[in-house]
């Protein structure tokens, strides 16, 4: 085992001991530390075999964090795609979530817009954009804003 392989393994294990990473993310971080691509490939394969690296576990962890922070399904999909997680893994992580995205959108809208839903066109558009940015789709946004309006 060469010095490069040992240091790369140690770097990978240190990174994975702090939090889960996607394969792509781990690869990128090891490359930034200056490790050669062949060594990184071998180390990624090694940690995959040991079960220390799992895109499915990473996606599930990210899903929990996203929901806890009040972001929507589209935001979760976008973040996981940026980390190059496979589409079927993303679908599996979403299926494991027992969250009602409509109710989450309603909670986020209620928390953000304490003064209520605006009937002024520009303010209403601003509220819609905020919920879009948070990763909710139009049906969820419509439900959240109508539900918040009826709660007043």
Curated annotation (Swiss-Prot):
Keywords: Cytoplasm. It is found in: Cytoplasm. Coiled coil: none annotated. One of its GO terms (cellular component) is cytoplasm. Its main location: cytoplasm. GO terms for biological process: regulation of DNA repair. InterPro entries: RecX_HTH_1st, RecX_HTH_2nd, RecX_HTH_3rd, Regulatory_RecX, WH-like_DNA-bd_sf. Modulates RecA activity. Belongs to the RecX family. This is Regulatory protein RecX. It comes from Vibrio cholerae serotype O1 (strain ATCC 39315 / El Tor Inaba N16961). The gene is recX.
């Amino acid at each position: 085992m060469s010095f490069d392989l040992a240091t790369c393994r140690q770097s990978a294990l240190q990174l994975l001991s702090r939090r889960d990473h996607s394969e792509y993310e781990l690869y990128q971080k090891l490359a930034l530390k200056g490790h050669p691509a062949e060594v990184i490939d071998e180390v990624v394969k090694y940690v995959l075999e040991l079960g220390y690296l799992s895109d499915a576990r990473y996606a599930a962890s990210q899903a929990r964090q996203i929901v806890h922070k009040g972001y929507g399904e589209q935001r979760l999909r976008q973040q996981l795609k940026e980390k190059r997680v496979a589409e079927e893994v993303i679908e599996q992580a979403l299926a494991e979530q027992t969250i009602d995205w409509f109710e989450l959108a309603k909670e986020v809208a209620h928390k953000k817009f304490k003064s209520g839903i605006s009937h002024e066109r520009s303010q209403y558009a601003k509220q819609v954009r905020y919920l879009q940015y948070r990763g909710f789709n139009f049906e969820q946004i419509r439900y959240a804003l109508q539900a918040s309006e009826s709660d007043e």
